[in-house]
A protein has these predicted regions:
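Short alpha-helical
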Residues: 11-14, 41, 75-76, 106
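Structural signal for interior beta-strand "rungs" in well-ordered beta-sheet cores
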Residues: 93-124
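NAD(P)-binding Rossmann-fold cofactor-contacting core
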Residues: 23-46
Length: 124
């Protein structure tokens, strides 16, 4: 079983946490380990979330860790993903169980497909 680490504990990260618990593979292929966020107090006002494990800059991936970014800023997302990949981390996609896919759809690693999303055939 893999351990999902969500990079970013802001609003997008909390949304992704909820979606991941209803995603294909949850509880069978992965469980949620926690968050990486530079702000250790990012979740202090919220209950029911996994812990912040540290900042992306300081985290060393464990062998069973897999990652997904939940950062709205594209430059920050790319920077944090590169930091984790440089240390051997791998990214997975989170696909909500209610998503619908046509023929020949390709979803790349690190993608987040939300609930009720629909993809037409031949989408890449």
């Amino acid at each position: 079983m893999k351990n999902l680490v969500i990079i970013g504990a802001g609003g997008f990260g909390r949304e992704l946490f909820s979606a991941a618990r209803e995603a294909i593979g949850f509880g069978e292929q992965f469980r949620i380990k926690g968050y990486l966020d530079a702000n250790p107090a990012a979740l202090d006002r919220f209950a029911g979330y996994p812990p912040i494990l540290g900042a992306p800059e300081n985290y060393t991936p464990a062998p069973d860790d897999v990652f997904i970014t939940a950062l709205g800023n594209i430059a920050s997302r790319k920077r944090c993903a590169a930091l984790i990949e440089e240390r051997g981390g791998t990214f997975i996609s989170i696909i909500h169980r209610s998503a619908s896919f046509g023929q020949n759809v390709t979803v790349g690693p690190g993608s987040f497909i939300a609930h009720n999303a629909e993809f037409c055939p031949d989408w890449h």
